[in-house]
Regions:
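Glycine-rich FAD pyrophosphate-binding loop
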Residues: 46-66
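Short, hinge-like loop/turn segments at secondary-structure boundaries
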Residues: 68-73, 136, 169-170
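Flexible hinge/switch segments at interdomain interfaces of large molecular machines
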Residues: 158-166
Length: 229
């Protein structure tokens, strides 16, 4: 059995990496080539900024390439509990922030035509006990009232049809979640950032940075550069 992440093991090679010396000066230096860093670099490059991504290993080589491959809506805490503790407005804002994040990922895939097997199957939260189902029913009703009319409460029979198991008493289906091959997504995102002008240096560890006139001096394992931000 291999120790490499399945996503990384089956991702295409990244062809857009810089092989030469670091640039002497850029508008923005991004530390880390995970999803967040690559998405930021792409967005900045599209706005006309000069951007360098400094990645100690390979792009998406850590948490971004080692996860469940899911991009889901919904809050980790029970929505009914969240609404009760924070109020409907804040709970709704949290829920909608997750929905916006999922849509941002979907939009990236569509805009850059990233082949990552994206599927919008939704997320199913399962009830292992009758009391769990009762809680899901209350949560479902509140979500429908406050923020998402498309959420659906599934019976035990409907849940069995979804998961091919009779062990559950029902489930809560939130339709906006997506699943994808995160290795292909990450490499596709890196290729897109590079295509739009971001300079991506792999195997380049940032050792420290210091504020100086007009920005920062960023020191790496492959030399130093000046970044405005």
């Amino acid at each position: 059995m291999g120790s490499e992440s399945y996503w990384l093991d089956t991702a295409p090679a990244f062809t857009g990496a810089q092989l030469g010396a670091l640039p002497g000066q850029v508008d923005v230096a991004v530390v880390g080539g995970g999803f967040t860093g690559l998405a930021a670099a792409r967005a900045l490059a599209l706005k006309g900024a000069s951007v360098v991504v400094l990645e100690a290993g390979r792009v998406i080589g850590e948490a971004s390439g080692r996860n469940g491959g899911q991009c889901n809506t919904g809050v980790a805490q029970d929505y009914a509990g969240l609404s009760a503790s924070l109020g409907a407005d804040k709970a709704r804002a949290y829920y909608q922030a997750y929905e916006s994040a999922v849509q941002s990922v979907v939009s990236l895939v569509e805009q850059e035509q990233i082949a990552c097997d994206l599927k919008r199957n939704g997320k199913l939260k399962l009830a292992a006990k009758p009391m769990h189902y009762e809680g899901l029913a209350r949560t479902c009703e509140l979500i429908r009232q406050e923020v998402d009319a498309e959420v659906e409460l599934l019976t035990a029979e409907q849940t069995r049809a979804e998961v091919n198991s009779a062990q559950f008493h029902g489930g809560l289906l939130q339709r906006n979640g997506v699943q994808m091959h995160v290795g292909r997504f990450g490499v596709g995102l890196a290729e897109a950032a590079a295509r739009h002008g971001a300079l991506i240096h792999q195997g380049t560890s940032v050792t420290d940075w210091k504020a100086q006139a007009g920005g920062y001096r960023v020191n790496t394992s492959k030399g130093s550069l000046h970044a405005g931000q």
